[in-house]
Amino acid sequence: WPRCCRGSPVAVAMRAGPVLRLCAHPGLRYRQGQRPGPGTREYFYYLDHQGQLFLDDTKVKNFITCFKDVGFLSFFFEHLQRNRSGRYEAEFPFLSRCGRERNFLRCDDLPVVFTQILPGPDGNPLLSYCGGGARLAVPFQPGMLAVFPENGRLYHPAPRRAGGVGLVRSALAAEWSSGFQFGEGSERPPTHFWWEGTWYRLSGELLGILRAEKS
């Protein structure tokens, strides 16, 4: 394995002892660490709506059992892309490669979940995602926030390779909830957002991407 893969938490566990676990979802069978070909291993992951990453077959998914190593998380999500490998594309729509290692990902919602806001080096805030701190962050764009009417969740632009849009964690969305203005009535998505002394008109540009993603 390349160094990045050899040092991953899963790879370390594989070397320490057998962790091959058979998973059988309806119509789906896989084994963590399976070898579909010489020199190739496959692992399967799940991302919840709080931005926590787990091995897909972890029975109890909570803060204790999620991955927390920033180096691993950063590498995993920096290399995340649509799964066009020809394997598990419907069940695991995203894939993070590390050399010949394939890391398949399915999500509760989207493969990017913004979890905290950080100060940026130029004074402009950053929005960090999936536990990566400043290593996984994009510039915060208040005017691009969007509430998706079908589920009431809040979204923000994300890296293009991961679909271009990410979910804002519910706790962070709740912190910002008082800043939204509903200029077209409470039954419609908000039209403006108050941030650091400025009203931002919400463009709604992400709504089309979200509808296509969830159709």
Please place each PLM-identified region on the residue numbering.
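Long, non-globular segments of proteins
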Residues: 1-215
